[in-house]
């Protein structure tokens, strides 16, 4: 038994063979080396899956049940010890509060009125004042109710989403990402917004002082984590990345765990890079929520500044900017739950030319109900380098309570540093900084190839359209919180329907669908296959049975895999009885805009069809790209998390389509059912063709 009273330590295992028949249990104690290895692994992964347990069995020469029961006992012991420590702290705080309460009661007995110097109110007078306040509150409440009823009676009726859907045209055709009407036709005004913007509340002086102190503490903690590498950082025994040593961190931070459930865990990671952007410009992008989303379009789905507190606050050191931000992060697939944070973001220059941007969660006095994630002090250190370069060191340190369970195929990926970790932020920053540098070129670089893009302005217009296409595609992937058709989800396809009200998108009802699967090929192999124009007509419904040629290529990064391309679809004269017809428009005018990239963690291929007239506006450079309607579909390619690079291991592939529903009048329910059936068949057939062409039909 554990001498600390925490139950079995997990280091003694009992067998139940003949000894159990004789009324005794045989005890086998683990060796010190086995215990040391198990303790170290428990710090990194307290909930190992079957594969990890089998790996430990082979390494420590133990039975699977011994490993399983050891981790169960260890978790129970840790929970008991944490509860005991919490109880001791709470008991001490309770005694302190009782002492303070008694002291304040004694002080109240001798308090004097500051106005007249007389004794305090008696009990009867205080009761009389309270009664007057209650009457005043009741009067104000009645006045508010009467005004509210008057407003409701005279407010005009507004159409609901159901009412607007009742007037939707029938499914005479389904347009796969193309607006069949006027290119500049405004989107429908009906339908709910994508998310409810958190309304800011006025901050009192005490709130501002508290937020500034929290930010100052976060900056000081990040200084130590950035500058004392050997003291706080160790290599993970799972994926060889650097993680925070829990014992060393708790000795100096005194951090309080915000989640006590068995599904909660702490993620930590760090990464470093050098980018070709001036430090001041980089800081400005980090502090502007719109530029923050543009800089990390594949991670930051939504962001909003709640309060900007400025620099005139009683904060230790030189605080340049202090603000409260809300952000929603989402990656890879609808099978991966989004993460929401309400953070205090502080930018502070700690030395000449060196800044720290610190984020730390804080929920007090804000309308924020998502309590599944808590960000411990995280952020980046930015150092200005010569020749307009910047060195960026990044730390992510987050507590996560998996209330919404992640799909099993993404668990290995999220358990390492490849999910929401620092490496993903760094590789995205590298890619987007390269793209910004190339987009600022005034002339046509020799790396580009184009038959239709002839000016630098046209080149920038097409690149901006590609950026907006990627942003729209990633926003569409956030459908994990709501599944409109659970019967399709059981078949592996997630379907969602929305009334499109976004500017720059075709107006009407849009059906979004996605499906994710694991493929036993490397991400580079899958990316190369999907990029191959010779085989594209075998899986892409837009070019099925045709010939696809590339007529323009704009390189957006140091690798030629990162590019924006314009594809032309040439129809053939061969007849195919199995050919699926998605729309009746002539394919002589079919073009596709495609934006793709590949980095150290995976890649993305996003594309959307356009007719000749729309593409002419895009490449002319004379029209704002945000006015061009576009509805993208595409693929997200990621490693499966079992290796550290995209050059080995397996692939997790997400396929996502968007379909615009249009036509003549019909009942909305019939439109929805037909649309869902069509898009489900479309995505399922595409996946089957891809699996067949990759020779992995069973994956």
Curated annotation (Swiss-Prot):
Primary location group: nucleus
Residues within the DNA-binding region(s): 23-82
Coiled coil region boundaries: 89-149
Keywords tagged on the record: Coiled coil, DNA-binding, Homeobox, Nucleus, Transcription, Transcription regulation
START domain boundaries: 204-438
Keyword check for Ligase: no
The name this protein goes by in its record: Homeobox-leucine zipper protein HDG8
Originating species: Arabidopsis thaliana (Mouse-ear cress)
Ranges of biased composition (kind: Basic residues): 22-31
Compositional bias annotation for Polar residues: 10-19
UniProt subunit comment: Interacts with ANT.
UniProt keyword Transcription present: yes
């Amino acid at each position: 038994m554990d001498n600390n009273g925490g139950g079995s330590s997990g280091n003694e295992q009992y067998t139940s063979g003949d000894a159990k028949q004789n009324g005794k249990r045989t005890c086998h104690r683990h060796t010190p080396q086995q215990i040391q290895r198990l303790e170290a692994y428990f710090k990194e992964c307290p909930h190992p899956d079957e594969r990890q347990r089998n790996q430990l069995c082979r390494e420590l020469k133990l039975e699977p049940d011994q490993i399983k029961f050891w981790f169960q006992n260890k978790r129970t012991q840790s929970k008991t010890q944490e509860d005991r420590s919490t109880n001791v702290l709470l008991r001490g705080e309770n005694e302190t509060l009782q002492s303070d309460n008694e002291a304040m009661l004694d002080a109240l007995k001798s308090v004097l009125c500051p106005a007249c110097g007389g004794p305090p109110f008696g009990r009867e007078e205080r009761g009389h004042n309270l009664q007057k306040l209650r009457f005043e509150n009741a009067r104000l409440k009645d006045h508010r109710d009467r005004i509210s009823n008057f407003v409701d009676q005279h407010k005009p009726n507004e159409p609901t989403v159901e009412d607007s859907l009742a007037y939707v045209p029938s499914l005479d055709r389904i347009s796969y990402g193309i607006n069949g009407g006027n290119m500049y036709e405004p989107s429908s005004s009906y339908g709910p917004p994508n998310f409810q913007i958190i309304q800011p509340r006025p901050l009192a002086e005490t709130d501002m002082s508290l937020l500034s102190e929290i930010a100052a503490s976060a900056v000081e903690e990040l200084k130590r984590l950035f500058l004392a590498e050997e003291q706080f950082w160790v290599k993970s025994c799972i994926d060889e990345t650097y993680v925070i040593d829990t014992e060393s961190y708790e000795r100096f931070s005194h951090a309080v765990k915000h989640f006590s459930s068995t599904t909660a865990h702490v993620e930590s990671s760090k990464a470093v890079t050098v980018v070709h952007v001036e430090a001041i410009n980089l800081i400005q992008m980090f502090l502007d929520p719109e530029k923050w989303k543009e800089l990390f379009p594949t991670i930051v789905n939504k962001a909003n500044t709640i309060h900007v507190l400025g620099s005139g606050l009683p904060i230790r050191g030189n605080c340049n900017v202090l603000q409260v931000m809300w952000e929603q992060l989402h990656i890879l697939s609808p099978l991966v739950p989004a993460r929401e944070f309400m953070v205090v973001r502080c930018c502070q220059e700690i030395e000449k030319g060196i800044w720290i941007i610190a984020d730390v969660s804080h929920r007090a006095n804000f309308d924020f109900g998502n309590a599944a994630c808590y960000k411990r002090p995280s952020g980046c250190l930015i150092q200005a380098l010569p020749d307009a370069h910047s060195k960026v060191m990044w730390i992510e340190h987050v507590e996560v309570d998996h209330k919404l369970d992640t799909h099993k195929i993404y668990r290995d990926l999220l358990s390492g540093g490849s999910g929401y970790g620092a490496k993903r932020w760094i590789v995205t920053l590298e890619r987007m900084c390269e793209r910004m540098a190339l987009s600022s070129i005034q002339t046509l670089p020799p790396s580009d190839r184009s038959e239709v893009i002839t000016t630098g302005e046209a080149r920038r217009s097409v690149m901006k359209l590609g950026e907006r296409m990627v942003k729209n595609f990633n926003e569409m992937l956030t459908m994990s919180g709501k599944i409109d058709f659970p019967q399709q989800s059981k078949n592996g396809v997630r379907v969602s329907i929305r009334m499109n009200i976004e500017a720059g998108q075709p107006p009407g009802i849009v059906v979004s669908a996605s499906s994710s699967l694991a493929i036993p090929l490397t991400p580079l192999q899958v990316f190369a296959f999907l990029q191959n124009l010779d085989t594209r007509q075998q899986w892409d419904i837009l070019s099925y049975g045709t010939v696809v040629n590339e007529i323009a290529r704009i390189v957006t990064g140091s690798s030629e895999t990162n590019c924006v391309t314009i594809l032309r679809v040439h129809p053939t004269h061969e007849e195919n009885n199995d050919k699926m017809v998605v729309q009746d428009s002539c394919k002589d005018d079919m073009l596709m805009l495609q934006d793709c990239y590949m980095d150290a963690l995976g890649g993305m291929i996003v594309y959307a069809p356009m007719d000749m007239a729309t593409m002419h506006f895009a490449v002319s450079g004379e029209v704002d790209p945000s006015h061009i309607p576009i509805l993208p579909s595409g693929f997200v390619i990621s490693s499966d998390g079992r290796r550290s690079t995209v050059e080995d291991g397996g692939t997790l592939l997400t396929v996502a389509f968007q379909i615009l529903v249009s036509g003549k009048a019909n009942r909305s329910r019939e439109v929805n059912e037909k649309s869902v059936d069509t898009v489900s068949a479309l995505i399922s057939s595409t996946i089957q063709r891809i699996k067949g062409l990759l020779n992995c039909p069973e994956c």
